[in-house]
Design a protein with these regions (language model features):
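N-terminal catalytic cores of NTP/NDP-binding nucleotidyl/phosphoryl-transfer enzymes
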Residues: 1-8
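Short Ser/Thr-interspersed hydrophobic loop/turn segments at strand-loop and sheet-helix junctions
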Residues: 11-18
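Feature 926 captures the class I aminoacyl-tRNA synthetase adenylation module centered on the KMSKS loop
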Residues: 19-57, 61, 80-81, 85-395
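Structured mid-domain segments that build the active-site/substrate or prosthetic-cofactor binding neighborhood
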Residues: 67-70
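Transmembrane helix-loop junctions at the membrane interface of multipass transporters and ion channels
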Residues: 74-76
Length: 395
């Protein structure tokens, strides 16, 4: 624990410096203390903890291991152990991981396909979705390796969690029909190959953190040329030929628009199965607009809208009302506050949007110059066209 900073770690440092004139170690990973769910130390007499054997039988060793490694306890901080926390890890990370593997195995067995992972050695996939999956799988290797090289165990798991989410909630969901097709055409073959490579890469990258599940997956995915265990494999090195930052930017841009669109639907209780006339995307970034235009079909399908409309100004869709922030301006203006409130209430939509974008607006109040910003002015929308569509501000 952290108490060893002045104990064993200190002793080693002093001895090494005195006897050998060099550091005892270059890096030191220190764990914190795992407390019971009530915040007290785990105690046999209090029985304030779950029996480890019962916890492993209930959740599996991987879930408990990942719960601890994906916490601040690996940064020498205290952590409260709870069955609920382990259950959350199981539901949000490990089950989705297994579901993606199960999806692949189920359909690969039905179609009697046996990917090798070599299809894209000399040529990239023709489908952008497959090329994107290969790219983010290589980025996964780079990000996790960088965190491990920095001895940052907690941060090393973040890219794995994100990748599992991307794999399930974007790639597989958007590719299902390709696997469902009856004919084994080139597109279907490439989809199997891309998913196979992604799963096998994920097994190798995540093996130090999720040793048992990744081993089970690997044993069924490996070919006759592979090592007999994932834990005997070299840690993967990214294939630079598969990395495509531009494609990742495009997909991230579309995902951002889709995510905000879904959020707006939830806000106004509009189920995704309910078709809408349009979605309005507000962006001033030329590159983002180009990407969104190219991926318009994907956006329409994801948000279940008939049309995608682009705007450069949010005030083309929404009208605003401005009010003075009396708490902030009152101290500055005193008796001029009432006059200022009237002037702020008369601000135009263009002036309000300028303030929302971080600009300052100078106004005269009885000869005194006052600069208005987002802290001094409270803004709220008073009208929007949500009846036939949804509007997404993209900056």
């Amino acid at each position: 624990g952290l108490d060893q900073t002045r104990g064993w770690f200190y002793t080693l440092t002093v001895l090494a410096a005195h006897l050998f004139d060099k550091p005892a170690f270059e890096n030191c990973v220190v764990n914190g203390i795992v407390l019971a769910s009530d915040g007290r130390k785990m105690s046999k007499s209090l029985r304030n903890y779950t029996d480890p054997v019962e916890a492993i039988d209930k959740f599996g060793a991987d879930a408990i291991r990942l719960f601890l490694m994906y916490s601040t306890v690996v940064k020498a901080d205290e952590i409260r152990y709870s069955d609920e926390g382990v259950r959350d890890i199981l539901k949000s990370i490990l089950i989705p991981l297994w579901n993606s593997y199960s999806f692949f195995v189920t359909y690969a067995n039905i179609d009697k396909v046996s990917p090798t992972g070599k299809l894209f050695d000399n040529a990239l996939p023709s489908n952008p979705l497959d090329a994107w999956l290969l790219s983010i799988s290589q980025k996964l290797i780079k990000d996790v390796s960088a965190a491990l090289d920095a001895y940052d165990l907690n941060s090393a798991i973040d890219p794995i969690v994100k990748f599992i989410d991307q794999l399930n909630n974007w790639y597989i969901r958007r590719s299902r029909r390709r696997f469902w097709k009856s004919e084994n055409d080139t597109d279907k073959t490439e989809a199997y190959e891309a998913l196979y490579i992604a799963l096998k890469t994920l097994c190798k990258v995540a093996a130090p953190f999720i040793p048992f599940i990744t081993e089970e997956m690997y044993l069924n995915l490996k070919t006759s040329e592979d090592k007999e265990s994932v834990h005997l494999c070299d840690y993967p090195v990214p294939n630079e030929n598969w990395l495509n930052e531009e494609l990742e930017f495009k997909m991230a841009t579309v995902q951002k628009a889709v995510s905000m669109g879904h959020s707006l639907r939830n806000t106004f209780n509009l189920k995704n199965r309910q078709p809408l006339a349009s979605v309005a995307l507000v962006t001033r970034n030329i590159e983002e607009k180009r990407v969104l235009s190219e991926m318009e079909d994907c956006i329409r399908e994801e948000l279940n809208v008939k049309k995608v409309i682009f705007h450069e100004r949010e005030d083309e869709l929404v009208e605003y009302k401005a009010k003075a922030n009396f708490k902030v301006l009152g101290k500055e203006l005193g008796p001029l506050m009432k006059k200022a409130a009237g002037i702020i209430a008369e601000l135009t939509s263009e002036q309000i949007v300028a303030i929302l974008e971080g600009n300052k607006l100078s106004v005269q109040i009885e000869g005194k110059s006052v600069e208005l910003d987002s802290e001094k002015v409270l803004v709220e929308p008073i009208a929007t066209n949500y009846g036939v569509g949804i509007a997404v501000r993209f900056w």
